Amino acid sequence: MVYLQKQDKEVFDAIKLELGRQRANIELIASENFVSEQVMEAMGSVLTNKYAEGYPGKRYYGGCEFVDIVEDLARDRAKKLFGAEYANVQPHSGAQANMAVYHTVLEPGDTVLGMNLSHGGHLTHGSPVNFSGVLYNFVEYGVREDTKEIDYDIVREAALKHKPKMIVAGASAYPRKIDFAKFREIADEVGAYLMVDMAHIAGLVAAGLHQNPVPYADFTTTTTHKTLRGPRGGMILAKAEWEQKLNKSIFPGIQGGPLMHVIAAKAVAFGEALQPEFTTYCEQIIRNSKKLAETLQANDVAVLTGGSDNHLLLIDLKPLGLTGKAAEKVLDEVGITVNKNTIPFETESPFVTSGIRVGVAAVTTRGFDEVAIEKVGVLISEVLHNLENEEVLADVKARVATLTNEYPLYPSL
């Protein structure tokens, strides 16, 4: 960043501080990951200069012959990765991918069945503070109070009762596998479209470690970061018959020019995900997640559902008399980054919460294995049991520094 350092030291210094934070902290936010240097290189390329409204071969501007190559690469790799007939890689985010799908088949006021936010859903699955909850009549399904897992009989009952035009499956804080085939059965029974938001598990799906929703869903949306380990962005997958309508929903429906430098980075990330090494990485994610859950529970920390089938798990802090807000703050002070998170049947506000969400995708990218992640579990447990013990917290902070130094991040930057 020699040019930036010379011309705008304030921005340069802030970026260097963030690099230092990422290197020094144990990153456990489930929606974050560390992209490769080549993904970052593509994002910082001259493609950021090019406006390219429309789609390859059908642009509203001239000079798009080379960015067309890039977008075609991204689309083809995405289709190969997930076995899809159609891919749109232009959505700027997962939220906009979801919006485009809604815009394609729903009218304002239509009924949609989605997962309760505090039970693990997402803002765009019908939260009243989000466009989805404002424009459409969302009704909710959730998890069982005893198991904290989705009960498909309850989902079916809700679908039969409300007769939604669409059912949304997928979650932002659900640690167990989701049965998309079962959702398809329920959707067919009530004549509903099925949209699956696989943003959190897309990498695991690509690696064959979670049921692929693409054969079952009418529409599959995802982000391109998280477990897929690409740049921040969105994507839509569907059958070829939806190409014209979905393309129109993205442009000119809800977006203007695509971000060609980000699409290039998506293409690079998809190329990485097609390699055998990516499957090995995702297998390690699962092992690390299970080991972390096991370690936390062995140290008297409550893990919802008793474990995890994916990259994340939810910690219930109520037995410890703690809030997510307090735990997040103190963990961050010792160099462990998590986020406060509501848990099913929450009694606290979303700004306080009774839980924290932890994910292992980023630390697994960094090279953490089961031995390292067991140490992380012990460190988290010590903090949660000693939230006001300065001596213990100082010791944990020192051990965090030792651990992160063993796994260098971006040494060439």
Swiss-Prot record:
A family per Pfam: SHMT
Residue positions where N6-(pyridoxal phosphate)lysine is found in the record: K226
- UniProt cofactor(s): pyridoxal 5'-phosphate
Which is one Gene Ontology cellular component term of this protein? cytoplasm
| This protein's UniProt keywords | Amino-acid biosynthesis, Cytoplasm, One-carbon metabolism, Pyridoxal phosphate, Transferase
Q: What class of enzyme is it?
A: transferase
Q: Where does this protein act, in terms of pathway?
A: One-carbon metabolism; tetrahydrofolate interconversion; Amino-acid biosynthesis; glycine biosynthesis; glycine from L-serine: step 1/1
Q: What is its EC number?
A: 2.1.2.1
Which amino acid positions bind (6S)-5,6,7,8-tetrahydrofolate, per UniProt? L117, G121, H122, L123, S349, P350, F351
Principal location class: cytoplasm
Domain of life of the source: Bacteria
* Gene Ontology terms describing biological process: glycine biosynthetic process from serine; tetrahydrofolate interconversion; tetrahydrofolate metabolic process
Question: InterPro entries under this entry?
Answer: PyrdxlP-dep_Trfase, PyrdxlP-dep_Trfase_major, PyrdxlP-dep_Trfase_small, Ser_HO-MeTrfase, Ser_HO-MeTrfase-like, Ser_HO-MeTrfase_PLP_BS, SHMT-like_dom
GO MF annotation list = glycine hydroxymethyltransferase activity; pyridoxal phosphate binding
- Reactions catalysed: (6R)-5,10-methylene-5,6,7,8-tetrahydrofolate + glycine + H2O = (6S)-5,6,7,8-tetrahydrofolate + L-serine
Q: Where is this site: Plays an important role in substrate specificity?
A: H225
Subcellular locations according to the entry? Cytoplasm
Q: How does it assemble?
A: Homodimer.
Q: What does this protein do?
A: Catalyzes the reversible interconversion of serine and glycine with tetrahydrofolate (THF) serving as the one-carbon carrier. This reaction serves as the major source of one-carbon groups required for the biosynthesis of purines, thymidylate, methionine, and other important biomolecules. Also exhibits THF-independent aldolase activity toward beta-hydroxyamino acids, producing glycine and aldehydes, via a retro-aldol mechanism.
Q: Which family does it belong to?
A: Belongs to the SHMT family.
HAMAP family in the cross-refs: SHMT
UniProt name for this protein: Serine hydroxymethyltransferase
Q: From what organism does this protein derive?
A: Listeria monocytogenes serovar 1/2a (strain ATCC BAA-679 / EGD-e)
